[in-house]
Amino acid sequence: MQPIYDWFREFYERTGINLTFIYDDFDRARVIKGFFLTLELSVVTIILSILVGIAGAWLQGSKLIWIRRIVAGFISFFRNTPPLVQIYFFYFGLGYLLPRLSDGAGGTVPMVSNLQWAIISLSLFAGAFNIEIFRSGIEAIPKSTMEAGTSLGLSRWQNYRFVILPMAIRVCLPALGNNLVNLVKTTNLAYAIAVPELLYVAKQIWGDSTNVREMMFFVLFAYLFLVFVLVAILHWIERRLAIPGFGQDAGKQMPQLSDVMVPVPSMPAAGGPAIARMLLLFVIMIGFGATVALAQTGTPKASAAEVLIRWMPLLLWGFAFNILISIAAMAVGTVAGVPVGIGQLSQWKVLRIGTRVATQLFRNSPWLVLLFLCVFLIPFEFRIFGLRIPFPDWAKAILGFSLPVMANTSELVRGAIRSIATGQWDGAQALGLSRWQTLRLVILPQSVKRMLPPWMNLYSLIAMSTVNASIVGVTEMITLTGQVHAAEGSRPELLAPLYAFALLCFFVYCYPIGKWTQALERRFQVKA
C-alpha cells in the first residue's frame, strides 16, 4: 500500500489537491475511526428507532386513554421540534441534572456520554415517525386477520406480535425505509455535541491541513455511499417480503400519487387538546429544570423564568430570523425545483438524465453537509467590475437549505405530473395543444393541488432544520440562546429551560402547519 500512499502525496505536490486522509497515517486512522463510529451510530439508532416504533404503535391501540394520550404527546413533541435542539436539550439540559460518576482517577465523568445522548435523542426522534408508519401498516391489515388471531385464543400482545406486526412491517417497508434513510443522514447532528463521527473528524483534519474542499466532498460521498448501501439492502428486503395485493403490485394498473411522490413525512394526527397538553408539558419542563437547578445551586440568583422574561425579545427575534431563513430557502428552492422536476420528464435524454442526477444527489445528501459545503466553499464576497459584493453567512445558509428544497420540490413536481391520468394528455393533444401548452395549461394546474400538502410538510422540516445554521455561526435563535447563557454567567442550570423555550417556539409554529397540511390532504385527496 505504501506506493499508493506515495502516489497520492506526489499528486498533492503536483496538483495541490490534498487527500491527506489517504496518504497520512494519522489522518487515515482518524477517518476510519470516524466512519465506523458513524456506521455504529446509524445501526444502533436504526434498531432502537424501530423498537420505539413497534412499542409505540402497540401502545396506540391500548384501551387506556391516558396511554394513548401519552403516545400522541410523544409523537407531537418529537415530530414538531428540531432534532438538533432535542440533542442540545438532552445533552446540556438533562445531562446536567444527572449525577456524575467517578472515573477512578480522582475525577468524574458524566453518567451518560455525548455519544449515548446522541443515540437516545436520534432514536426517539426517528421512533416518533416510525410509530405513525407502523400504525399505518397496522391499519392496512384487514380486520378479519385480527379477528382470526383472536378466535384462535391469542392474547392482544400475541396477536400483535405473531400476526399483525409481521404483516404490518411488510406493508409499510417502503415508508419505513425512507425514514431510516433520513435517520442515517441526520446522524451527523451528533457533530454538534462533539461526538467524533465522520463530519467531526473531517473538520479536525481540514483544520490541521487546510483542505476544506477535499474533506467536505469526501464526507459528502461517504454519506452517499452509506445511503446507497442502506437503500440497496432495504430494496432487497422489500422484494423478499413483498405481499401480493399490497404496495407496487396493487398499483400497477394506474400510478398512485403515494407511489411516485417524494417521501416527506406528514405530521401526526392529534385532537384539539393535544397542543394544550404539549404547552403544559413544556411549561413543566421549564419549571422542573429551574426548580432542580436552584435546589442544586442553593444561591439566590435570577430564576429561569426571570432570565427567560428578560431575554425573551432577543430570543424571539432570533426565532423570527429562523423563520425568515426558512421562507427564503423555500422560495429559492421551489423556484429552482419546479423546472428541474419538469426536466426529469423531458423528452431530451441529456436533460432528463442531468436533472435526475442532480435531484438524487441533493435529495440523498445530508442537509448539514450541504450547509457546510455552501458556508465553507463559497467566498465571503464577490468582485464584479471592481465592485465588492459581500455574501454573508446567512445568505450562504439560505443557499445551503435551498438545495435539498430544490431536490425535494423537483421530486414533488415529477411525482405529481406522473400521477395525472394519461387521458388528460390525450385530451389536450386532441385539442391541438403542444406538449408545453398541455403542461402549462392542463397538467401543472392540477398538479399544484397534489403537491401542496407534501410541500407544506417539506417547509415544516426546513423550518426545524434552520437551527443547523447555528453550527456554522449564523446568529439565529440557538446562537442567541448560547449568548444569553454566557451573559448569565454560563450557569448550567439554565440550559434546560433555555432549550425547552426554543423547543416550545418551534412546536407552536410547526404544529399548526401539520394540522393545516392534514386539512389540505383531506381536501385534495386523490380519488381512486
What does each of the following model-derived ranges do?
Residues M1-A528:
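Transmembrane alpha-helices and adjacent helix-loop boundaries
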